[in-house]
Design a protein with these regions (language model features):
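FAD-binding beta-loop-beta segment adjacent to the flavin cofactor pocket
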Residues: 177-180, 234-251, 307-313, 320-324
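N-terminal Rossmann-like FAD-binding beta1-loop-alpha1 element of flavoenzymes
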Residues: 4-40
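N-terminal Rossmann-like dinucleotide/flavin-binding domain of flavoprotein oxidoreductases
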Residues: 74, 78, 101-117
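Flavin-binding catalytic cores
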Residues: 203-233, 247-250, 271-295
Length: 372
């Protein structure tokens, strides 16, 4: 029977996703919106991460499916250094937190409900054309890449210890000797909060560096000296452009350019990438995924990363100046990849010019800024 017969056209096209991380399961959860495709997820047993951690994101149109699962929402957040504290307020785009395990369990349940198949070996790929295989395995990174690396403690303290109306996105009142370093604190209640020591640098540091920073911040800045650590998380996210895991296969998620190079934000951009791919199918195009980042944003990110690598001492002033210049909603739009040219100009005008002019003249700043 030829492929041109009506019966052949009525059969769903086999599609496979390699890996079972956030991108693979987020796509699988929406299999009901891809009725012309039969989706399978292929990952060897035991390869997926079992560590739970928090994914933060600003409310955007492509994240509606996540909203019922959020653990906490903040319309106010703070960015501060030793001299200045800026409180930002969002009217349209609040900041949310969802736990990895909660989201992944939700996606797995929906995927199973929608008939997605799961396999542990690649033998099921025999009937799948190469252009219909999407690889979500981690991309290849250069050993000298900038990293966002952190250790987080979820802590419990006495009632009234935390102000859960305001998230602390960046507090630079911590050791700045190893790169751009800040404390990130998400208060889930007046008793419980996630407190992370986050560092941007090419090299990891001993765990004691992060842990000392967390303890010191809790004691000296939050005035919380008596607390219990109820959960720990540890992660490192490569920053910049990376080659695909397998150049012969199309990528999705981090392997498809979804990680924001300057910030390491991935969760929101993975959902955006998948939403765009599904919209393309709805418009009559073949299923495929492209980077969710605009070329101009990738170029700006490359310049910004150069500043953070070579002149991290400017970071506290850069971020507090940016927070002071933008509204909360503008800040959310910019970091979510939804900036207009006017907003980008506003961001640039808030930056100290000399470090960025120096970064612009470095050879690395002129390198390729598009996806590999």
């Amino acid at each position: 029977m030829s492929d041109d017969t009506p019966l052949a056209h009525s059969l769903p096209t086999p599609v496979a996703v390699l890996g079972d991380g956030c991108a693979a399961l987020s796509l699988a959860a929406q299999a009901d919106r891809l009725s012309d495709y039969a989706l399978s997820v292929i990952a060897p047993a035991g390869t997926g991460s079992t560590q739970d951690h928090i994914w933060g994101f600003w409310q955007m149109p492509w994240l509606q499916d996540v909203l019922p699962l959020v653990r906490k929402t903040w319309s106010r957040w703070t960015i501060r250094n030793a001299e200045t504290a800026v409180v930002m307020q969002a009217a349209e785009y609040p900041y949310h937190a969802v736990t990895r395990q909660h989201w992944m369990a939700h996606c797995m349940a929906r995927a199973t409900q929608h008939g997605v198949t799961f396999a542990e070996d690649r033998s099921s790929l025999d009937d799948v054309k190469q252009r219909h295989i999407f690889d979500s395995r981690p991309p290849k990174r250069h050993p000298d890449m900038m990293l966002q690396h952190f250790i987080g403690w979820e802590v419990r303290a006495a009632a009234g210890s935390f102000d859960d109306s305001t998230a602390i996105l960046m507090d630079f009142r911590c050791d700045q000797t190893c790169g751009m370093h800040f404390i990130y604190c998400l208060p889930f209640s007046d008793r419980e909060a996630l407190v992370e020591s986050t560092l941007f640098s090419p090299a990891l540091v001993p765990d004691t560096f992060y842990e000392t920073a967390i303890s010191s911040w809790l004691n000296d800045c939050a005035n919380v000296s008596d607390f219990e650590v109820i959960r720990r998380e540890k992660w490192a996210i490569p920053l910049g452009l990376m080659a695909r895991h397998d150049p012969a296969l199309s990528g999705i998620g981090g392997n498809g350019g979804a990680i924001r190079p300057s910030s390491g934000y991935a969760f929101s951009f993975i959902q955006k990438q998948i939403a765009t791919g599904i919209a393309r199918v709805s418009a009559g195009n073949a299923l495929g995924f492209v980077t969710p980042h605009r070329p101009i944003d990738l170029w700006m990110d490359r310049i910004f990363l150069s500043v953070l690598r070579h002149q991290p001492q400017h970071a506290p002033q850069i971020f507090t100046a940016l927070a002071a210049r933008l509204t909360g909603d503008e800040f959310a739009l910019f970091l979510s990849g939804e900036a207009t040219m006017a907003l980008r100009a506003k961001v640039v005008s808030a930056m100290p010019p000399w470090p960025f002019l120096q970064a612009l003249l470095r050879p690395e700043a002129g390198a390729k800024v598009g996806p590999p």
